[in-house]
Amino acid sequence: MLIYPPIDPVALQIGPLAIHWYGLSYLAAFGLFMLLGCRRLRHPPFAGRTGPGAWSRKDVEDILFLGVAGVVLGGRLGYCLFYKPDYYLGHPLEVFALWQGGMAFHGGLLGVIVAMLWFAHSRQRPLLQVADFVAPCVPTGLAAGRVGNFINGELWGRFASPDLPWGMVFAHSGSMQPRHPSQVYQFLLEGLLLFVLLWLYARRERRQGQVAAAFLVGYGVLRFIAEQFREPDAFLGILALGMSMGQWLCLPMIAGGVLLWCRAARRRPAVARGSRA
């Protein structure tokens, strides 16, 4: 059994300016996206293309800029609407109080989809081509976010057996019983494992939409599994069929990914060009 080490959430204090570990995890996520996006330019069907439909570093920078806005706005709105709609309908101005915390992955995903729609329209590229480019670059950012969750000592897991060697006591959770370190599980599953599988899969030319579909299914399944060990939000608890809100939100992701895969399987192999598919 392990004891959660109290970690100062402030990484660096310069006068009145406090730099938090959680903010640094977001910065790391965006930096990793930029690095991997530039590497992604070497993968088919993006490598070796010239002309108006060719992908460049400038495209990666623009997607990152739009994606940051999508993650922050979508993640915040998703948290407010999916998890505490009654509260924020009564306190609408607190939606903008980002410093109070409260972000939701599924809301951030919707925000990123809107960002990709904007980018695809402005560049006259197929949306699925954009989604295929972005998808393999996302899991490392999710991993960085889970590191931030662990440092903050938040989103801990459900109670674990006292015999579990890596069971961890989060004293600030109000109980001295060991819990599953679900932040670590999610770091390993939806972060590292999903990245390795998706990155290897995306290195070969696939039909347009298949890489994005693999992300939706892969994340949905791995998050669903991880939610089995994560303590449900206290204000929601366990919902219908014994599932958490996170698990319910994963179901449309998985279904959408399967449908997209079936649709993509009927397409011809993807070609990176400027015209719409």
From Swiss-Prot:
List of residues binding a 1,2-diacyl-sn-glycero-3-phospho-(1'-sn-glycerol): 146
Superkingdom, natural source: Bacteria
A GO molecular-function descriptor: phosphatidylglycerol-prolipoprotein diacylglyceryl transferase activity
Compartment(s) where it occurs, according to its Swiss-Prot or TrEMBL record: Cell inner membrane
EC number: 2.5.1.145
Pathway the protein contributes to: Protein modification; lipoprotein biosynthesis (diacylglyceryl transfer)
Membrane topology note: Multi-pass membrane protein
Species, as recorded: Verminephrobacter eiseniae (strain EF01-2)
Keywords tagged on the record: Cell inner membrane, Cell membrane, Membrane, Transferase, Transmembrane, Transmembrane helix
PROSITE patterns hit by this protein: LGT
GO biological process: lipoprotein biosynthetic process
Function in brief: Catalyzes the transfer of the diacylglyceryl group from phosphatidylglycerol to the sulfhydryl group of the N-terminal cysteine of a prolipoprotein, the first step in the formation of mature lipoproteins.
Protein name as annotated: Phosphatidylglycerol--prolipoprotein diacylglyceryl transferase
GO CC term (a single one): plasma membrane
InterPro entries linked: Lgt
Enzyme class: transferase
